[in-house]
Amino acid sequence: MRSLTLSLVACSIAMAPLAAQQDRATFAVLPFQNEQSFGLPPETYVALESGLAQLLASELARSPAGQLADRGKTGEALGKRTVPPTRLDAASAQRIGALVGARYVVLGNFVDAYGKIRVNARIVDASSGRFLKAVSNDDPKLQSRDQLHRAVQSLARQILAELSLAAPTESPALPTPAVIAFSQGLAAEEAGDRAAAAKHFQAALDAAPGFADAKEAAARVR
């Protein structure tokens, strides 16, 4: 009897994390769109499209009530889209959400006017294809390029609050040079240049030694 009781307890303990995981809202964050930014080299803005999406995804995953759709599956789903990236809409987001098992899909865009940044995100309910809310870095203190990561953190907090999900755990804001280097690393990795990617990820870590996403990415391209 004691053996059966211990087995049931062990089973309950093993199942608890799985149940908690199933209760968490799954997000898919699609690459941001650059809306005619100026002030940095064009290739930097192209890189930021993936970089900002990854940083927002990481912030959403800091919520005890949030988790991310598989990054590889999301990339595959994007490759299957039938519209160009500049025309991603709610219907496209709904299809991608269904493919990757996401409850919510986030579409974003940004514009940099010589250092003044605007970052926007829209939440799509993947089950209905309905836009739920648009959020932005409305606080003037978060509209400088120097505050880019803080602006992304603000978007995550607004998204989670709109969905009545727990706020993300606190994390220090990253310096913008680290954000740019990380984004450039992602772009190089996506292009298949692992050596260049490793160099950029290391630059991101040099600028922000505690940058968890950069550490993970650097290990991935070794």
What are these regions (language model features)?
Residues 22-90, 105-112, 132:
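Short beta-strand->alpha-helix linker/helix-N-cap micro-motif
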